[in-house]
Amino acid sequence: MRIPRRPIRKALLAVLGLALFSIAGSAIAQSQDDPPNRVARLSFLRGDVSFQPSGDDDWVQANLNRPLGTGDRLYTDHDSRVEMEVGAATLRLDAQSSFNILNLNDTAAQTELTQGVMNLHVRRVFEGQSYEVDTPTLAFVVTQPGNYRVDIAPDGSSTMITVFSGTGDVYGENNASYSVRQGESVRFHDAALQDYEVLDIPRGDDFDSWVDSRNNRYEHATSRQYVSEDVIGYADLDDYGGWNDTPEYGHVWYPSQVDAGWAPYRSGHWAWVDPWGWTWVDNA
């Protein structure tokens, strides 16, 4: 397991079977000390992905279904990729990417990418919500649905923002701002947003193809007919079972296979997730 070469700047969790999270669309009245309702989930892992929980000094191997929150960090090694679900949005990292969750609450999902490539696919945005990606040179803010890509130059000197669909705003030093619209790809060479290039969207690479295949999985999931897209993990239901109508309960999901002697809380592990405490993380 490889540790990042340079430094990189927590929602009551209910996990049952596939670690589904129900996210309310409207904010629930909370006291100032209550944790946020929104949490991220590691929904796909491939290769060697390192994880540093908030407040820890050590890096460990990332686990599927792990809940993520403010202060958590990820690093993808060579030939590795990772996917995270945050409500009706999905974040994906390509190989050799350094990622940090700066702030995750009911309205804001502020992240940081200091190395590598990231795709942000937003299916829906509730009023007052935003998604932000900070890089070494700028901040990219999304407040509407769309498909976005962020590339950091190998030396960290520039950031390229690509908007496949939607619109996003870039912010830099001295209150500088720039709107990147659908069909545009802009490379920013400085933090003041004075030195930039407007480019045609590059030909899609292997990472883009993978992102498209994952997006299609979500968009064509049968479970979308029965479960809100805001339920984290809804697409996984298609992989492990199907839906039937019952006179008493209506639409009911049934697992396709149940091992003999199955019981809850056997296939997985308990993890301490601050500030919510011990949380069951399923292996499915």
What positions do the PLM features span?
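Bacterial N-terminal signal peptides that target proteins for export
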Residues: 2-14
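A short, compositionally biased domain-edge/stem linker segment
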Residues: 25-32, 230
